[in-house]
Amino acid sequence: MKKIIIGGCACLAGIGIAVGTYLYETAPSTHLPSKTEKPQQQESLPGNGDTLQTVESNGPVGYALTDELHITYDEGRHWSRVPIGIEALFAGEYNGQENELIEQSFFLSEDLTAFLYVEGADDQRVKLLYSLDQGHTWNDADIGGMIAPRFRKVDFLNEDHGYVVYTGERTMSSEATKVYMTHDSGETWTEVYHPDHYRLLYDGNFIDEKTGFLSYGTLNPEEPDLYVTQDGGQSWVPARIEIPDEYHLIFTTAETPYVEGNDLVLLVNQGSSGDYKGGKVKGKFISKDNGLSWSFQKEVDADE
């Protein structure tokens, strides 16, 4: 009798395991940010051959890049390793130098540190590794999309709101543009609309949660090609930039606008082959309608 009871219990246990396995495998998956505990801090000592050198910094926060990525929050006195492979930071359609991170592909502050990277060899995905506690823990966020990025940029307007812009699928002089927004410090990202425009992207930014810009044209443009949104990326329209006749074919590439006092300022440079005054000046334009139209103000030094 005992053998019968034991056999019956074993049979029921086996059925329970099988049912549980089936329910687990068929349940919908939920993508949650993963956390990685921070490794022990490594002190950088003067005179040590392995002393890390800051490549770029924002106040006391900076990074160093060797065969690993390190971060400091106290001007280089202490360093901690960022848990990411170097190759992921440069993956995609990038052929530049790898002795420093791709420009604009990271964000450094004492409250939030973030690095864009690419996951996967074939089906590449753009992701964000970020920390909200000065590197004690690191979170992974899936930005979205399945394309190998060329241009890539991450920025945060404040502790909650940020954006990612990247491009990919380049064919000759055209490519796709993707724009994503976060409102929870980088944990989740939502794709917003982008202009129905496929020229190569020069740069893009948001100056607040609603107002953003995308500047197109990198291959010998004849005039600036700037798009603006005033509703957080739900719609985009071409900005009107009034180029004086004497600067036609000279000021050709719009940079990203910025706030100066009560005005929006736009600098328009001469592109990669400009030679007006040695290519050392830009045009400064002012907008009074939040970026819809721009009026020429004056020439400024190219390094402004």
Give residue ranges: language-model regions.
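Extracellular glycan-interacting surfaces
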Residues: M1-E304
